């Protein structure tokens, strides 16, 4: 299928398994599609999912032409970082913070060069424990800070899901469980997690 510029906004969700699963029935991309329908915007907005399980920012950089730029997006939502952090300790496949920033910067530049708006999302959680008690919390905060800084540097929109999830869990994780409130396994979103992402991401999209 070829894509040409037209009056319809084309939003591409670019990421890892969280975005891939976001295309499922109760995933956040599907929920955003329902909001588009409910607000009578179907003729104005088209969404495309471009999430692949296991991806790091390096992988996004390598496949951006094929999976994003070739489709002429008007807005590209970049939601990546979990595997970059998680892989450092789980499998040795993650990226150190310097390489993470370099490849993330490359992704932003490529998208902007294609005249697409950009929305950056910080990675949410690896574990739902409160008070910075999850093993990767420190790294997630450091990598999220890189994304926040890049959003300011390139003057693009930020959906700070890291802060959203941490604040939610601090308030509502009464029994301090490691998973089950917003995720199925500490990482991948359950229905409530998808709803939370949808609420904040849709507001960011509309204000973009």
PLM segments and residue spans:
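Alpha-helical cap/lid subdomain in secreted, periplasmic
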Residues: 34-43, 58-208
């Amino acid at each position: 299928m070829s894509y040409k510029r037209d009056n319809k906004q084309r939003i591409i969700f670019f990421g890892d398994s969280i975005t891939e699963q976001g295309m499922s029935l109760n995933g956040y991309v599907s929920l955003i599609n329902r909001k588009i329908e409910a607000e009578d915007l179907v003729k104005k907005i088209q969404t495309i999912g471009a999430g692949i399980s296991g991806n790091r920012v390096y992988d996004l950089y390598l496949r951006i032409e094929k999976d994003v730029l070739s489709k002429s997006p008007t807005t590209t939502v970049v939601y990546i970082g979990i595997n970059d952090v998680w892989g450092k300790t789980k499998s040795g496949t993650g990226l150190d913070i310097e390489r993470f920033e370099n490849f993330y910067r490359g992704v932003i530049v490529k998208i902007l060069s294609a005249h697409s708006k950009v929305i950056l999302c910080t990675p949410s959680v690896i574990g739902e424990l409160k008070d910075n008690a999850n093993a990767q919390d420190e790294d997630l905060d450091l990598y999220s800070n890189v994304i926040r800084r890049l959003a300011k540097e390139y003057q693009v929109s930020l959906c700070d899901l890291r802060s959203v999830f941490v604040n939610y869990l601090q308030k509502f994780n009464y029994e301090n469980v490691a998973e089950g409130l917003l995720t199925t396994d500490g990482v991948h979103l359950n229905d409530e997690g998808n709803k939370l992402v949808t609420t904040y991401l849709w507001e960011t999209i509309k204000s973009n």
